Amino acid sequence: MIPTVIEQSARGERAFDIYSRLLRDRIIFLGTQVDDDIANLIVAQMLYLESEDPEKDIYLYINSPGGSVYAGMAIYDTMQHIQPDVSTICIGLAASMGAFLLAGGAKGKRIALPHARIMIHQPLGGAQGPATDIEIQAKEILFIKNSLNSLLAYHTGQPLERIERDTDRDNFMTPEQAKEYGLIDQVITRRPQPSLAAVS
């Protein structure tokens, strides 16, 4: 069930679902596993907000266990492609692709709340079928792993060798540890201004 918000104006009452109301404040919420449907929605929202105002920041709140690498990369590439800075804010958990998207936010605008958790690891594989197909899938997994590690090294400033070592197994971090690692830039408790969008 998605809550609705009622707004009063001179023209009368208007009802919004909560996510549409947040979108008016340039807030996008990723609160599920990352799949193609969710990625398409988030990409569309980012493109819409860019068309509305290419100069104003977009705020991507993340509470996600991760999900599809391909779907996540569609979101990531759009974040880098559009003109507005995308500020990423971790609430709850940003794991796997969720952590990757968190790190991919605009430098200086990657945030976690104090009791959030961040987890990085290598991509998961599940190859089945004939040996030749498994070989193709194994090569693809290695390509994805190397790509993600290189991008994490870029966004965190960590050496590639350390990223490879630290993502070999599930690696959970507190916000303070994630800040020290370079995945985020700030740990905040309260927004500096009352506006929903004032977290930059």
From Swiss-Prot:
The active site is at residues 96, 121. One of its GO terms (biological process) is protein quality control for misfolded or incompletely synthesized proteins. It catalyses: Hydrolysis of proteins to small peptides in the presence of ATP and magnesium. alpha-casein is the usual test substrate. In the absence of ATP, only oligopeptides shorter than five residues are hydrolyzed (such as succinyl-Leu-Tyr-|-NHMec, and Leu-Tyr-Leu-|-Tyr-Trp, in which cleavage of the -Tyr-|-Leu- and -Tyr-|-Trp bonds also occurs). GO terms for molecular function: ATP-dependent peptidase activity; ATPase binding; serine-type endopeptidase activity. One of its GO terms (cellular component) is cytoplasm. It comes from the Bacteria. InterPro entries: ClpP (IPR001907), ClpP/crotonase-like_dom_sf (IPR029045), ClpP/TepA (IPR023562), ClpP_His_AS (IPR033135), ClpP_Ser_AS (IPR018215). The keyword ATP-binding does not apply. Keywords: Cytoplasm, Hydrolase, Protease, Serine protease. It is found in: Cytoplasm. Its EC number is 3.4.21.92. Pfam families: CLP_protease (PF00574). Disulfide bonds: none annotated. PANTHER family: ATP-DEPENDENT CLP PROTEASE PROTEOLYTIC SUBUNIT (PTHR10381:SF70). Cleaves peptides in various proteins in a process that requires ATP hydrolysis. Has a chymotrypsin-like activity. Plays a major role in the degradation of misfolded proteins. Belongs to the peptidase S14 family. NCBIfam families: clpP (TIGR00493), PRK00277.1 (NF001368), PRK12553.1 (NF009205). Fourteen ClpP subunits assemble into 2 heptameric rings which stack back to back to give a disk-like structure with a central cavity, resembling the structure of eukaryotic proteasomes. This is ATP-dependent Clp protease proteolytic subunit 2.
